[in-house]
């Protein structure tokens, strides 16, 4: 087997206003400004994550893509959020030259999803509905966020993408080009 060039690339994903609104109801804390994701360079496996439904993913104005396996419009696998060099989950903040780990969102132990995994959690509700800001675990800021499931942000992005796909069904074929 020769080492061929990988079809998977890294990209920084901008969290748009619509995505931020969507994520803020599903995770504790403020969603980061940017996250790093893996995506497929092969066009037919690309899926955009922006909430707009009036375009195909290759023409997505945001250019934000998540790794998908299978048909063009079916999101099967979540994007993998991680820092390749340090093998840690990282997110760049909007402040120039700084970065912060996504552990503040409770994602510090996130593992790469296994291909073919059938574990589909539809929604990841906030586990602590009561504001448990001051835990017994040292009183660190955001320590209660570590109680969240590790893939909340990924699931939210994946669900957002699939919602966009479901909303666009039946709207695309208005005659004309084939």
From Swiss-Prot:
Family label: Belongs to the phytoreovirus RNA-binding protein family.
GO molecular function, one term: RNA binding
Organism: Wound tumor virus (WTV)
Keywords linked to the UniProt accession: Host cytoplasm, RNA-binding
UniProt feature, compositional bias: Basic residues: 168-178
Biological role: Constituent of viral factories. Binds to ssRNA and dsRNA.
Region (Disordered): 113-178
Cellular component, GO annotation: host cell cytoplasm
Pfam families: Pns11_12
Name listed for the protein in its UniProt record: RNA-binding protein
Annotated localization: Host cytoplasm
